[in-house]
Structures are given as C-alpha cells and as structure tokens.
Amino acid sequence: MSLVPYMLDLTLIFVNACREKAQTNELFQLDKVATRYAIDIIGKVAMDTDFNSQIRPHPIVETFRRQITLLPTTSIGPFDDLNVLRPFQLWWNTRKLNSLIGKEVDREIDARTSTAQAQTNGHANKSVSFKERRRSILDLALDAYEKENPASATQKTAFSAAFRRTLVDSLKTFIFAGHDTTSATISYTMYLLHLHPNVYKRVAEEIDSVFGTDCTPEQIAAGIRSQPHSINKLEYLNAVIKETLRLFPPASTLRALSDEDGSSKNVFITDPKSGRSYPIRGFDAWPIAHMIHRNEAYFPEPVKFIPERFLQSETPFPDAKLFTPAGKDAWRPFEKGPRNCIGQELAMMESRILLACVVKEVDFTAEYDGKKIDSWTPIETVDEYADGIPGTKRRTIEGHAAYQVLSGAANPAGAMPGRLRLRSTI
C-alpha cells in the first residue's frame, strides 16, 4: 500500500492523456499509452527511479521498448520472422540497456556506501536513513548482499562483478515482467467494457457506491489516497479484471523437468479421462493458461465475457467446478506454484486503481482497418482459423480483431488502435 500515492499520481497523468485524446478524437494505440503508465510504476518498484515516461521519453524506457521490438514474434516457425540483422541489433541494444541500468545500480551503491561511511565517521544525517524510506527491489537485493558480505556496506569495491551482472539481469526481468503484462490487461479491460455496456454500468455503479455519485477521477484518487484499502471494496471490478485475464492471459510458464539433480524422476502426467499415467522425466512441461481457461468444466461458455463467474454468490454457473477444490488452480494468468508471478498483487492493484479512475471518464472504442468495433460475436468470418490456409491473413480470433500477438508478452494486435470519447458527451 505504500506505493498507492505514487500510483495515483501516475494514474491522473494517464487520465489527463486520455482526456486530451478524447477531445482531439485522435486514433492512437491504447496499449502503448498504458505501457508507459505501467513501466513508470515498475521503475519505482524495482529501482526507486522516476521514469516519468508518460510526460517525456526516458532512456531506460526507450531502450527497453526497443529491446522488446527486437525479440522474435514467433516461437515455432524459425523462418517466419527471419531477420539476419537482429542478433547484432539485440547485442548492441542489450549492451546499452545493461549500461543504463548498471548506472542506476552504481548510483544506489554509491549512495549507500557514502551514507554508511558517514555514519561510521559520526557525520550521518540521522533524519535520512535507508531503513526509513520505501524499499525497492534493488534495495532489498543490496541488503541481502551486504548481510553476506559486510565489507560491501562501506566499500564499493567489495561488490563482485558477478553479483552486479546478476543484479542488472534480475532488474531487467522485473521491469519486463512488471509492465508489459499489466498494460495489456488495462487495454483489454477498457476494450471489453465498451463491448459490454451492461458490465460497464455495474462497474460504474460500484465505483459510485464506494466513492460517491458522479465523482471525478481526481475525487476518486483523493478517496483512495485517504483510504487506500477502499480499492479492495471494488469486488465487481476485480471480477472484471479476472475475467479479462481469463480471456486474454498475458503469459505462461515453461517448467523444465530436468534429470540433472534427479528431482523429476517420479514426475508423471495423468489423463483425467482414462486415469492412465505417463512419465515425463526429462521433458519440459508447458501449462498453457489460454487453453486451461477455456475448459468448460470450470468456465462454461468460455469465450464469453461473464465477470459474474468469479463471484461465488452470483455465478450463473453454480455447477461449474471453479469453486470446488479441483478448481482452485483453474484460473492461472499469473501461473501457480513456486514459479508463479511474485508481482501479481501489485499488478492487480495498479489495474484496479487506474480503471477505477478512468472508466467513468472516457469510453474506448477499438478501431481496426477503419472499422469501429462496437459489437462482438464469437465467430465473425470464415477465416476464423485462417492461419491454416496458406496465404490467408487471420482477421479475428473468437470474434476479436484485437486478438493476442507475441510482442514480448501476449499483447493486443496492433497495440489496440482506437479512439476515446468523454463519457460526459455520450
């Protein structure tokens, strides 16, 4: 909750950007705007750095986004996305990114060692303590290293080069995982609320019930700032976000069942229908959330957007297995087990805060090939599965032109192009 005030400041910047785009009726890519909001938050969480990329370009953000555009966009066909220059471009951009993040690491190490030396010499400012301020991931990593290597607290040279490299790589992972998936969730939620006005109506009513009727984004932000836990009262909005993540899970996890340490020698996968077990020692297991989320035993009418399915007292599917012991692992956009996403609570919180402030202010309409997407049907064209037809371009998946594509994580096709309208003018 200590990050809530910072999230609110960034949220209001996002809201104002949306207002400007609504007033100009500009065609823009929502996912790119949401990305800058999300990466500003994770920059603060990871390194206690203010990127402020919603206001002006930041070198780390620009280099990071460049890195993502250089990643392959297919994971199966090796020649489908062939680019002979890519390895060299990635090498150069990686060096640049490592240098930029390395400077942030060095800045923090310098500050810590200077403070520790001043305290040792009796010249420290007691009012400024690393223990008193917000703890970033970088802070926590340095704390752990200093505990194992006490000399590093006062001597910068005591930090090993190997530790620094690992720390830079870890920070890159946190920044990547902490922004790309959240921005896609925000974009898809705003897209789906336009397609389902009955769901939007209930979200708006819930926001009114918690923060007051006809509150502005600034008033809602003030309410959350004074009572941060009030955001947890938005149970229906939370269900909306969960349903969005069910339909459009941004990532999944590959589990390597290595034989090297013998830990996987008794690992089996069991066919639930036949009960037959198969050894998978030495294989990689890939639990694909997108497929699991369409299992009708847990999620009836799986391609439909029905947030109520996550509210046990209101679910239209009381016979589904979702709320049984067997269903506890059915919803898995952040994966499960020891390799699950450690930032899932942060991701859900920043999504709730932003959406609570923005959805009553503006309405987003996706627009593909000059066509506004105002309605949805599960299968819209004969080419629903067009990638199986040579030379045919896929137009929709499950009726969505904003289907997911591989761009770092799973992001909306075309970065979700569309236009905004002020709800006060609708």
Give the role of each language-model region:
Residues 203, 244, 282, 305, ...:
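Hydrophobic, well-ordered secondary-structure elements that form the walls
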Residues 60-65, 121, 195-251, 281, ...:
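Cytochrome P450 I-helix active-site segment
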Residues 287-322:
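Conserved cytochrome P450 K-helix/beta-meander segment immediately N-terminal to the heme-binding cysteine loop
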Residues 2-186, 202, 207, 221-224, ...:
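Cytochrome P450 heme-thiolate monooxygenase catalytic core
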Residues 181-194, 354:
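Short, small-residue alpha-helix embedded
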Residues 224-243, 254-286, 301, 306:
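Cytochrome P450 C-terminal beta-domain/meander region
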Residues 411-426:
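C-terminal helix/juxtamembrane-tail motif
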Residues 197-199, 327, 344-405:
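Cytochrome P450 heme-binding "Cys pocket" and the immediately downstream C-terminal segment
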